[in-house]
Amino acid sequence: MTIQQDPAAFSVVRCQGARTSNPEPGLVRAVGASSKNLLLAEHRMQKGWAGARHQHPHEQLVYVVSGHLQITVDQTSFEVRAGDSFVVPGSTEHQASALEDSWVIDVFTPCREEYL
């Protein structure tokens, strides 16, 4: 990943060659641009991957680039596919399962510093 900064105090994150992590089997994460208030993360999930039910104080906006997932937010479950988006309010329990290989873009506010 290459980060370029100019005098105007903004940065461009080039994702070609980005450093990725595998926080758990079946999940690959790449982190894009971030600031004190925002963080963009790309997640790729293998079919059959199921994340643990969890919550965090960050508001999370999710855009599904490709694939098919089942999402549970609080007690409501729904399915999402490529082109769909949704918001998970901060401190709300949620969980995702990949019904097929899937790729999502997540935007968190404030920044999830543990992803950096």
Give residue spans per PLM region.
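Anionic, Ser/Thr-rich low-complexity intrinsically disordered regions
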Residues: 21, 41, 73, 105-106, ...
